[in-house]
């Protein structure tokens, strides 16, 4: 089938057109959006394939997608902004800011830095990820889902940690929900409002907002999300209604918030990444704060078993790969039912964002992992 492209063709970057049309076709993905920037200039913004398989509407450069965990860099920059303003310290404990006691005494030792670097003490491989544990939360609280982030954090305050805070790295969505509560408490406004004021407004990023779960509540310029297996489930948002496509209410999507709840255009994502191409001129954070964002974590979070530094590690809200002369590649990927996202800032001033309205690669694995090396290769630098 023919994969149509929308947006302006850029003669110097046609390698990306070829890559995207082939990738969308071969992977059997409905649609995708790619934006590329270089040192402060948005050079490329195109849509490929279909935003909605049912209506045949194409993806446009202005189409918004759920960005899943690419939300984390925005949450991280927001909290670092509060650190920069002196409102909170990066090594401050989070518990006093949550305003409730915790069952496990080790909670008192969890810091903001731990949450940023996924070192808080929660390991979803051991105790599961609370963002999907609707049944357990219901049995414990007797409150039916959906759950907002504050309810999920409150539930987890009553659960034991999986390891001593700071001891190691285990990817944790909960840690970012905790950071969302910290932002609201310290800033005195709700999480979304603070991110908008502190992170989005200075860059003129108007497409970003927290998305909605139900089909009827979607934005008019938002892609329609398709899962590979077209699975359905009962809606948490309308439990007595008919089964819904999985992305439209079968997950607790409106509770994802600070760890994975935003929607955006690829162009706005790449403008955000591009703001970090030169630490000295970043409109969001000072160079010393960016150094915190990129810092290698202590212990095995940043080092191999033999003590050697890892080639790549999770910093504050971004994966970090040191390249040379203090220059780094930063990136984050995201995956939820019906969408995937990848945002990359390279050390040499190039950045890109790619968004899909489906999840999972035809070959197994995920779309962001499959396309990442192809994008670096297409740039040919």
Enumerate the predicted regions with their spans.
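Short, conserved catalytic-motif segment at the N-terminal edge
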Residues: 7-67
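Short, gly/Ser/Thr-rich active-site loops of penicillin-recognizing serine hydrolases
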Residues: 294-304, 309, 323, 360-381
